[in-house]
Design a protein with these regions (language model features):
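Loop/turn elements at helix/coil->beta-strand transitions in domains of secreted/extracellular proteins
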Residues: 35-39, 65-70, 97-102, 132-133, ...
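Structural microenvironment flanking redox-active thiols in thiol-disulfide oxidoreductases
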Residues: 50-114
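Amphipathic alpha-helical repeat scaffolds
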Residues: 43-47
């Protein structure tokens, strides 16, 4: 049933402003709130050679958030390089790296269990993350920027 509802939702999604993620702090992150703003969604991992890119994502967020640009980190263990719990990811990112960018709970980004946003990206652009720290830039109108 979950997959059927997910498929129905994806077929109806016409822009990136149609998705809700679970916030690592609890509650939800609704991309509809970012309507009219560009944003970057990045699948991340704490134990990856690319983890150092978090620093650049934080700088990007700090530089442009007052202009309405958002950055969303989506921790994923799809490539077996993420910590085992949301709490561990949150502590690592906040305490060890000093990050305060918006972040989801650990989320699947590929395969049958992928979050509806990533299924939508696959449908729209035939793009599936092949590794950690893939960046998906969304325009202020909710379209994927290539």
């Amino acid at each position: 049933m979950r997959y059927l509802l997910s498929a129905i939702f994806i077929l109806g999604a016409s822009s990136a402003m149609s998705f809700v993620f679970s916030n690592i702090d609890g509650g939800n992150i609704d991309t509809k709130k970012w309507e009219g703003q560009p944003f970057l969604i990045v699948n991340t991992a704490s134990k990856c050679g690319f983890t150092k890119q978090y620093k650049g994502l934080q700088k990007l967020f700090d530089t442009y958030r007052d202009d309405g640009f958002m950055v969303l980190a989506v921790p994923s263990n799809d490539f077996k390089q993420e910590l085992k719990s949301n709490e561990a990811v949150k502590d690592f990112c906040e305490l060890d790296l000093g990050l305060n960018i918006p972040m989801t709970q650990i989320t699947s980004v590929k395969g049958n269990g992928a979050h509806p946003f990533f299924k939508w990206v696959e449908k729209e652009k035939s793009f599936i993350p092949k590794w950690n720290f893939n960046k998906i830039l969304i325009s202020a109108t909710g379209e994927i920027v290539e």
